[in-house]
Amino acid sequence: MSEQKIEVVGKLGSTYGIRGWLRLYSSTEKAESIFDYQPWFLKIKGQWQLIELESWRYHSNDLIVKLKGTEDREAAQLLTNAEIGVDLSVFPKLGEEDYYWHDLINCQVVNLENYTMGVVTELMETGSNDVLVVRANSKDAFGKQERLIPFLYKQVVKRVDLSTKTITVDWDAGF
């Protein structure tokens, strides 16, 4: 898989029934969108393996899936908790000021005074806007361990340079 870059989009949960079905936990914005990204790879024993989706449906409020070659409960149990990944090439291209969260993770964040705020470890969705969770450097001059910085392009986030993995923000280092 060296030529492919895999992004995790979900995870298999516990088995459902005796015919090889599994619960599915989707990381996509809309749970059903996970089915738009094919083919799937499962991380089994640390290795990504191509897997084919046979069928899916809702059971109550849960998504459940049937994978080809998984015919019974015992076979399905071997896949419990496996991460589901897709090749990054299947994601649609975005506009100039739009970014996938996975592109922003591990970016260095600096403010307009060129103070290094830390590194993006995750993003949160708040309803009104996304928020960068920035882990501060261990020797942060302001004693911060973590900063929450709203991802408001042009207002707070002034520049994103994915080639250097740098995000420039208009944000006080003391916050």
Swiss-Prot record:
InterPro entries: PRC_barrel-like_sf, PRC_RimM, RimM, RimM_N, RimM_N_sf, Transl_B-barrel_sf. One of its GO terms (molecular function) is ribosome binding. GO terms for cellular component: cytoplasm; ribosome. Keywords: Chaperone, Cytoplasm, Ribosome biogenesis, rRNA processing. The keyword Coiled coil does not apply. It is found in: Cytoplasm. Gene3D superfamilies: PRC-barrel domain, RimM. Residues 96-175 form the PRC barrel domain. GO terms for biological process: ribosomal small subunit biogenesis; rRNA processing. Its main location: cytoplasm. Binds ribosomal protein uS19. PANTHER family: RIBOSOME MATURATION FACTOR RIMM. Belongs to the RimM family. NCBIfam families: 16S_RimM (TIGR02273). An accessory protein needed during the final step in the assembly of 30S ribosomal subunit, possibly for assembly of the head region. Essential for efficient processing of 16S rRNA. May be needed both before and after RbfA during the maturation of 16S rRNA. It has affinity for free ribosomal 30S subunits but not for 70S ribosomes. The PRC barrel domain binds ribosomal protein uS19. This is Ribosome maturation factor RimM. It comes from Haemophilus ducreyi (strain 35000HP / ATCC 700724). The lineage of its organism: Bacteria, Pseudomonadati, Pseudomonadota, Gammaproteobacteria, Pasteurellales. The gene is rimM.
